[in-house]
Curated annotation (Swiss-Prot):
Any one cellular-component term (Gene Ontology): cell periphery
Keywords assigned: Membrane, Phosphoprotein, Transmembrane, Transmembrane helix
Intervals, Cytoplasmic compartment: 1-13, 66-76, 142-822
Protein name: Uncharacterized protein IRC8
Gene name tied to this protein: IRC8
Membrane topology (Extracellular): 35-44, 98-120
Region (Disordered): 271-290, 698-728, 751-783
TM annotation in the entry: 14-34, 45-65, 77-97, 121-141
Compositionally biased residues, Polar residues: 698-712
Cellular localisation: Membrane
Length: 822
């Protein structure tokens, strides 16, 4: 159960006690089973003793074998085994007390000698089992909780107690840092524990001894400069012994036993935390600097005073400080290898060093954005040949990161980055004094020199380098300011390169119009209309068209959006003598196009004018013949140009603005104030008069040449196959049920109380040899033909001979009016 406590205590003794307890429990259970089988049939105390001893002995034996043979960390029984180890010995003890109490109160009658041996053996095993189990249980409660389960909780409590004690002793404060310490967190260890910083303590001692020995000398402010921030002395973080706790705090000891019943997940978590705390601190100290690699600690930002003190100390020949420099691990990137001689190494040579810290530092410097550095300081990954590297090695001159104090000629403070095997910074050589003034006046900005320019290269190819810089600068990579046109479109005599002026194209217009609209001839305009991409462009073109001048733009928009001007729409479209388009069409689309497309109102007319127009208008026989005959001589009549381009624009403009529903105010009944039913639908219009849709169909087909051509090409095939496609046309039309009713649906009633509407008299179509009356203007309609859509369908069926014109409605049901499809 308690593997960690067993390893920390007397492992051999504890395992012996555990093994003996397991064997005694199993033996006690076996003797109790023998007594139950032979002599005591039904004794409850013995049954409970058998169960408790076997349940306790078998898992204990398994745990012992696991700890001795297998790896203890690979096998864990867990929470249930802890409960058994604690509860089963108590159950066994209770049953043993009850067993001895019953034996003393009523002695057991011995039946045979073997019976006596069983009883004696059972009594002895019970006593020894209770004794050994008590010892093992004591080990569990003492060592197990204190060392294993309570270890992590004790560590947490002691750490918290240490923090509280230090806070009470030193007082609460907010520690402040220098700006250099925030950038180099390694220096924080100077004020930390002396045990972990034995190699760095020489810095503080050197500062104090130098100020004491040289008291009579005048010390510069750089050498003896101290921080202006008050530093609070902090005690060591790691303590060797735990503080004493009050003796009366017994409640904390009771909390330890709660961890005895933890499950396997909690035990695994505590084992991991305990193993993590046992990692030796020596290995961690060797890689102390790796945790600061991702920060700015790789870039030195130490104050000038600290660096100058180190330089002067090295000048005076004080080697004791460097002797005590830590040999393992870097405390700071500056305090390391102070007495090494200056070595100039190229970046190519620095890659041969196998130090992991230097590799990490080099990667950290490489992560700096190269856009923030000048060209001579940018890190390049180009490989340098050995000959070129040896040739340029003498020409490099290291640049110190921080300016140093002027000293004698025999002393030189090495570069900080060179000392720590970092990237060298080559210095760009200065230009000779004779041309320095002229060069600075001509090139005031940054000079884009090559990445690596040595002194020897500069002496050899000085003119070539400067020429390359001038050519790169003369090439303008950006367009001049506010230049929207190319140089070829501009007049060189009127504009200069540095002139800040807006130059617009001569043919610029907004919105954009294609050049084809301006240069198209009259013949091309009659054959094809150029369509714009969207409604907004169409609206702009319509409102700014110079050909439309007879009306105001606001009036045009208002009249186009008006959906109730049926009279003006019909009058504008009615007198046009246009042939009907022969292909199938949608009457609903025709009416919508008529209403919304050509709704330009010039003069308002009354309903009487509309009724007079209906009465006097008719179509001749030639129009019907053109519909039924597919002669090629009549093809060009459908593709005739518009008589008025203004109406075409108005129609397309209104069609793009909206598509409204049909507001049918026409009625097949005559207006009569006496008949309330007919008057509600009639509105005073004449009966049996249809609207001529020929002009609307012509507008729909003629504004698109592709549509007109395709329609004319299909005319012959459609007319020839008219008889075979009557069934399909009948199925496609939505109002077919109005013309194909059953026998009992010859009449319709509005409701149960209204009188049945009588079917009208049959209207015979009068025809002559030269002229036949139009089926749409002078024919009679049944009562089921209610709307304009139904009238148009009725006319089509009449023209196609699908409805017998001579038959009357009263002679039979409506089913007889329709000739059967062949």
């Amino acid at each position: 159960m308690c593997h960690n406590s067993v390893r920390s205590g007397n492992k051999a003794g504890f395992l012996g006690i555990k093994f003996g307890s397991a064997l005694l429990s199993i033996a006690t259970g076996a003797i109790a089973i023998a007594l139950l089988c032979k002599f005591h049939d039904h004794e409850a105390v013995l049954i409970v003793i058998v169960c408790s001893t076997l349940l306790y002995g078998i898992p204990s034996l398994i745990s012992f074998i696991t700890e001795t043979v297998f790896a203890p960390s690979k096998f864990h029984i867990g929470y249930f085994y802890n409960v058994l180890n604690f509860a089963l010995p108590l159950i066994t003890m209770g049953c043993t007390v009850d067993y001895f109490h019953n034996t003393l109160r009523s002695p057991i009658s011995v039946q045979s000698e073997s019976h006596r041996v069983y009883i004696t053996t059972l009594d002895s095993l019970l006593i020894f089992t209770l004794f050994i189990n008590g010892i093992q249980l004591g080990f569990f409660l003492k060592d197990g909780n204190a060392n294993n389960f309570g270890s992590s909780s004790n560590n947490i409590s002691t750490d918290q107690y240490d923090k509280e004690a230090n806070a009470v002793e030193n007082g609460r404060f907010v520690p402040l840092k220098n700006s250099s310490q925030t950038l180099t967190p390694d220096l924080e260890l100077l004020h930390g524990s002396p045990k972990s910083m034995n190699g760095v303590a020489w810095l503080i001692n050197e500062l104090s001894t130098n100020s004491n020995t040289n008291a009579n000398k005048t010390i510069s402010s750089d050498e003896n400069s101290n921080s202006s921030v008050i530093r609070h002395k902090l005690g060591p973080i790691s303590t060797s012994k735990c503080p004493k706790k009050p003796s009366h705090s017994h409640f904390s000891k009771l909390k330890k036993y709660n961890s005895f019943f933890l499950g396997p997940k909690e035990n695994r978590y505590k084992r991991n935390t305990q193993q993590a705390t046992k990692v030796p601190t020596e290995k961690k100290s060797n890689h102390r600097s790796s945790q600061y690699v991702s920060r700015l600690s790789t870039i030195s930002d130490i104050s000038k005073s600290f660096l100058n003190f180190l330089a002067l100390n090295e000048k005076n020949g004080n080697s004791t400080s460097t002797a005590r420099t830590p040999s393992e691990g870097r405390v700071s990137i500056i305090i390391n290898e102070g007495n090494n001689t200056l070595k100039y190494k190229t970046p190519h040579d620095s890659h041969t060093i196998d130090s992991p810290n230097l590799e990490l530092e080099r990667e950290a410097i490489g992560r700096i954005n190269s856009a923030l550095l000048p060209a001579c300081l940018r890190v390049t990954d180009k490989m340098i040949s050995p000959q070129q590297s040896t040739q340029n090695e003498d020409s490099y001159q290291a640049t110190p990161l921080i300016p140093q104090v002027e000293v004698d000629d025999d002393f030189y403070v090495g570069d900080i980055l060179m000392t720590n095997e970092l990237q060298d910074i080559p210095q760009v050589p200065r230009i000779s004094s004779d041309i320095e003034d002229d060069f600075e006046q001509q090139y005031t900005k940054h000079v884009d020199l090559p990445a690596r320019v040595t002194l020897e290269m500069w002496e050899k190819d000085q003119e070539k380098i400067l020429q390359k810089v001038t050519t790169n600068r003369d090439k303008s990579k950006l367009l001049p300011p506010f230049r929207f046109t190319s140089e070829s479109d501009m007049d060189p005599s009127t504009s200069t390169e540095l002139e800040v002026e807006l130059h617009a194209q001569n043919n610029f217009s907004f919105p954009f119009k294609s050049a084809g609209l301006q240069i198209a001839t009259s013949d091309q305009f009659n054959q094809q209309e150029f369509k714009t991409s969207d409604t907004i462009s169409e609206l702009d073109e319509y409102l700014h068209d110079p050909s439309i001048q007879e009306e105001d733009a606001s009036q045009l928009i208002e009249s186009s959006l008006n959906q109730n001007n049926l009279s003006s729409t019909t009058i504008d479209n009615g007198p046009k003598d246009m042939s009907r388009f022969s292909t199938r069409h949608s009457p609903t689309k025709s009416i919508i196009s008529m209403i919304s497309g050509s709704g330009s109102v010039k003069h308002q007319h009354s309903h009487s004018t509309l009724s007079n127009f209906f009465t006097g208008h008719s179509r001749n026989n030639s129009q019907i013949n053109q519909l039924l005959q597919g002669s090629s001589s009549n093809m060009m009549s459908n593709t005739s140009p518009h008589s008025s381009p203004t109406k075409s624009l108005r129609m397309r403009f209104g069609k793009k603005l909206s598509l409204s529903n049909i507001s049918d105010t026409m009625s097949p009944y005559e207006g009569s104030t006496t008949d309330p039913i007919n008057y509600s639908f009639g509105h005073g219009h004449n009966k049996n008069q249809s609207i001529d849709f020929s002009y609307v169909r012509t507008l729909q087909s003629s504004h698109s040449p592709t549509k007109s051509t395709s329609g004319n090409s299909r005319r012959d095939s459609l007319n020839n196959d008219r008889t075979q496609s009557t069934v399909n046309e009948r199925a496609l039309r939505t109002a077919s049920t109005l013309f194909y009713l059953q026998h009992n649906n010859a009449t319709c009633t509005l409701n149960g109380e209204e009188p049945v509407l009588d079917t009208p008299q049959s209207i015979q179509s009068s025809s002559s040899g030269s002229e036949q009356e139009s089926a749409g203007s002078g024919s009679g309609y049944p009562e089921v033909v209610f709307s304009e859509y139904d009238r148009e369908k009725w006319n089509v069926l009449r023209n196609l001979k699908e409805i017998a014109p001579e038959k009357t409605i009263e002679s039979g049901p409506v089913e007889e009016l329709v000739s059967p499809s062949k």
